[in-house]
Amino acid sequence: VNGGYWFEAPEWKKHFLREVEVIRGRFDDYSNLPLDVNGDGWTDIVSVNYRSKSLFWVEHPGEAIKANPDTPWQKRLIDTPGPMETGRLADLDGDGDPDIIPNGVGFACWYEFDKGKFIKHELPQELSGHGIGVGDVNGDRRLDLVGPTGWLEAPADPKKGRWLWHAEFELSRDASVPILV
């Protein structure tokens, strides 16, 4: 998937997926995350966007795609939390389903994915900014979140517990990489 198209292997034939808005001279398509949102066995796409400030998913047309590979996918809004540069899928709550972690500019949150629903959980705002990573930073077997100036330590229950901010570093123009996850 790239923008408004999907590419069929093995020849990588281009097919229409959806219209992508152009907002203030830029395509509003910052991150496409593969996820079967509605549980029908087909891979849908979750889209994280900067200019429209929207988080939405586009529903795979299912069997209809076999007859017409250019069948448009249906857009379904999840939320409009604010501008997002990218997003990550990771199982933050350990329930076996990937959750959505948007890279918010001016806000920080994650969306618990539960049986086709998305439940928003706020995070400490220090995480917001340019860049996000997910991994076990401190070796406690929980997925922590890394931001541009530090990292958030995941609590035992990421849905209800307090995420602890660690202001560990400051990224500068020298491209230093203080934490790898």
Q: Each PLM stretch: what is its role?
A:
Residues 1-181:
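Beta-propeller-forming repeat regions
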